């Protein structure tokens, strides 16, 4: 019986790129709480002792950006120079401009050539769902995120007090080539920042027994499963001191772990007029409802947009041979049941709210948080009925 391997990774909230994402989304939320129609493109850079805030923001909101940045960094756990980054002591620079009026006229209703709210940029976005996990996400990315959430939980509640904020996990999974189903877990890689006093042996044992085994399905862990824990032997220097962090540099971690294509546009720090974010959320919503309806066990959708134009320039669907109806019929159903114009997406998913901070670590998809409207399967029944199944 032939097999193949597939790997995905996740990173913790203390990873420098994720620190940047969380600061950007915290600033977005602070603005949307006061001004839901704000235009925000908030970029963040974090390095040793430094946090730089830049981008384009047009808003009536009055926000203390420096305070928001410091509070976010502190909540993550960087509150001492001993950890490599200190929320209270780092320098924070603010360099925001306003959105270009040339872009604004294409996005604001009634101002551009297309009188509807146009897309904020050209681009292509993907959505994906499959039946490998309860939340209809690919196995490797779903469980990589859960490992990182477990690391954070044990760090914050004090059960493993030598843990520090920066960490990464990577899962390699064995699939059956004939059925496409997960057979077993081949390799677990987990690297975590730690207090210098802990030995590698003690750390490895605790990570395997208290982080990995409580999270991963025990029936998929075998005698052949390999565990690579802090493989360099030491991970004391981490976070923004170990590496410079930038918003938007973990786009595969944020989405499907490489199991589906990515259009290239990052999410964090962007208000919902940016289709990079809102249309990617809508695509996940569409794909998840198609799988939840039983119309396919695997579904990938691509949409594309032109700046200033409301209607998508293309919609395509691939069910990888698992569809119960043709892909042409699925596209027709999608057009009938989902409004994929930018304003329609915002209304359909109720996106003009301060809901984004939670999405900036541990994945934007496959988490049944009440704010994550794109994870609902409320269209599944109507799709199934319309398909005649």
Curated annotation (Swiss-Prot):
Localization in the cell: Cytoplasm
Keyword terms: ATP-binding, Cytoplasm, Magnesium, Metal-binding, Nucleotide-binding, One-carbon metabolism, Potassium, Transferase
GO cellular component: cytoplasm
Residues reported to bind Mg(2+): 17
Record: residues binding K(+): 43
Annotated spans, Flexible loop: 99-109
Top class in the EC scheme: transferase
Positions bound to ATP: 15, 166-168, 234-235, 243, 249-250, 266, 270
Keyword Transferase appears in the UniProt entry: yes
Pathway note: Amino-acid biosynthesis; S-adenosyl-L-methionine biosynthesis; S-adenosyl-L-methionine from L-methionine: step 1/1
Amino-acid positions noted as binding L-methionine in the UniProt annotation, renumbered to this chain: 56, 99, 243, 274
Stored Pfam families: S-AdoMet_synt_C, S-AdoMet_synt_M, S-AdoMet_synt_N
Family: Belongs to the AdoMet synthase family.
The protein, known as: S-adenosylmethionine synthase
